[in-house]
Amino acid sequence: MKTSDYLKKYGIRLKKHLGQVFLSDDRIAKRIVKEADLKPDDVVVEIGAGAGTLTEELAKTGARVIAYEIDEGLAPILQERLSKYPNVELRFEDFLKARDVPEEAICVSNIPYSVTGPIMEKIIEWRFKKAIVMVQKEVGERILSKPGRKSYGYLSVVVQTFYEVRKLFDVSRSYFVPNPEVDSVVVEMKRKAVEIDFPQFKKFVSMIFSKKRKTLKNNLRPFLSVFEGVDLSRRAEQLSIEEIIELYNIWRRALECSEE
């Protein structure tokens, strides 16, 4: 049965405030799962199970699947599609409020458009060892972007600091119900071995990108004494990930000294 048929069968009305669009083509779901290269002993977290197209393909791998879905109105569809898979746990709750995501889990998700930014931050916070995520094409460009490009900014830096990223493939808007206004892209994220405090780091990155066209000297004005002798004439969008980490470490050490 097609996703659209399930929606009709249960009289599901899409909730605009949740930005609901559902993947309707199982070929795309199969390709995503193939890229994830899951093993039966893996623990997989899906954020936004929707109508279960991707969830069902994840279940077929034999891995333990924890599928989050904020809309309990989709329960009849998900329960019908997934009842034969004992390895699937449905959690009808907001992933952003989750408190017990398993360690060393893998995230495989079609990220809900309306909360992409907060969810990407949560993926970093939970330190998933790998993530295969489908996002809006424009968001994917920001995740993958390099210094000097218009799309390079806060999201590029926080994701690439903690993960190696690469583009896997594009997904046309025609593969969704209803058709969104934009195309999507599937991105792979592999965790790096870095020891950086994420909440503190994202605060610093947000600060240096607060006025994107201004120089570091302008955006770091309250902390200029900390960066004495450091060239702050460039803009944050011109800096590599490594250069930003160096600046962050100077700022972090200064904060630690001031608290002693």
Curated annotation (Swiss-Prot):
Keywords: Cytoplasm, Methyltransferase, RNA-binding, rRNA processing, S-adenosyl-L-methionine, Transferase
Catalysed reactions, semicolon-separated: adenosine(1518)/adenosine(1519) in 16S rRNA + 4 S-adenosyl-L-methionine = N(6)-dimethyladenosine(1518)/N(6)-dimethyladenosine(1519) in 16S rRNA + 4 S-adenosyl-L-homocysteine + 4 H(+)
SUPFAM superfamilies assigned to the protein according to its UniProt record, in alphabetical order: S-adenosyl-L-methionine-dependent methyltransferases
Binding site for S-adenosyl-L-methionine: 23, 48, 69, 94, 110
CDD domains xrefs: AdoMet_MTases (cd02440)
This protein's GO CC annotations: cytosol
Enzyme class: transferase
GO molecular function, one term: 16S rRNA (adenine(1518)-N(6)/adenine(1519)-N(6))-dimethyltransferase activity
The EC number(s) this enzyme carries: 2.1.1.182
UniProt xrefs under InterPro entries: KsgA/Erm, rRNA_Ade_diMease-like_C, rRNA_Ade_Mease_Trfase_CS, rRNA_Ade_methylase_Trfase_N, rRNA_adenine_dimethylase, SAM-dependent_MTases_sf
Alphabetical list of Gene3D superfamilies matching this protein: Ribosomal RNA adenine dimethylase-like, domain 2 (1.10.8.100), Vaccinia Virus protein VP39 (3.40.50.150)
Tree of life domain: Bacteria
Cell location: Cytoplasm
Annotated family: Belongs to the class I-like SAM-binding methyltransferase superfamily. rRNA adenine N(6)-methyltransferase family. RsmA subfamily.
Purpose: Specifically dimethylates two adjacent adenosines (A1518 and A1519) in the loop of a conserved hairpin near the 3'-end of 16S rRNA in the 30S particle. May play a critical role in biogenesis of 30S subunits.
Protein name (Swiss-Prot/TrEMBL): Ribosomal RNA small subunit methyltransferase A
Organism, as annotated: Thermotoga neapolitana (strain ATCC 49049 / DSM 4359 / NBRC 107923 / NS-E)
